[in-house]
Amino acid sequence: MNNVKDKVVVITGASSGIGEETVNLLSENGAKLVLGARRLDRLEKIQQKVGHDSVSIKKTDVTKPDEVNALIETAYNDFGRIDVLINNAGLMPQSFLEKNKQDEWNQMIDVNIKGVLYGIGAVLPYMRKQKSGHIINLASVAGHVVFPGSAVYCGTKYAVRAITEGLRQEEAIVGSNIRTTILSPGAVSTELTDHISDKDMKQDIDELYKNAIKPDAIARAINYAINEPEESSVNEFIIRPSSQSL
């Protein structure tokens, strides 16, 4: 069974890590992909590797609603429908609240929460009209448990889970046939830790990430959720290294 083939999938944060690995796997399974990220040069390289016929790209900063809307419009204009949106873009600067890193707080809120909301708001009219769709939001194990030094990041990921569950209930009530999935990774080997400016926190996180799993593990979970029959919905995954205790 391959329910991924020919589905039109939009992915934010597609230029590296989980996003890029998801592109690789879904393209192997025949999906048509629309990729958004701030680094257009990286997207162009991915497009060349995967193939122009099945991949469209759009420079996208998820903190800007107009750019998110343009990404969704590109998907519809190029392929005529939108089957899946994967809200993957995210940031994880870490610090204790007393450090008062307000710029980093705002960055996390803008990308991790508002970016997800902008994606949902942009794609819902298309999915409602076609009476089908699937929205996959990347949360985190930090959306299930709070760590010292991670209060704001955890807050953003708890918010992603709450928003996605609210969306699931609202779409079930109206019978739109729109599926939702929350995917909560643990330590994954990506660029996510590069944004940590606090030296003490960076050292602790780097220690945790010594046993990080590869991003293709998350890509496989995404592929699984999309591949499920339309009448069933995989609502939530937690995927972390076997050795990760938290």
UniProtKB/Swiss-Prot annotation:
It comes from the Bacteria. Its EC number is 1.-.-.-. Pfam families: adh_short. It is an enzyme of class 1 (oxidoreductase). InterPro entries: NAD(P)-bd_dom_sf, Sc_DH/Rdtase_CS, SDR_fam. The keyword Oxidoreductase applies. NADP(+) binds at residues 10-34. The active site is at residue 153. Substrate binds at residue 140. Keywords: Oxidoreductase. One of its GO terms (molecular function) is oxidoreductase activity. Belongs to the short-chain dehydrogenases/reductases (SDR) family. This is Uncharacterized oxidoreductase SSP1627. It comes from Staphylococcus saprophyticus subsp. saprophyticus (strain ATCC 15305 / DSM 20229 / NCIMB 8711 / NCTC 7292 / S-41).
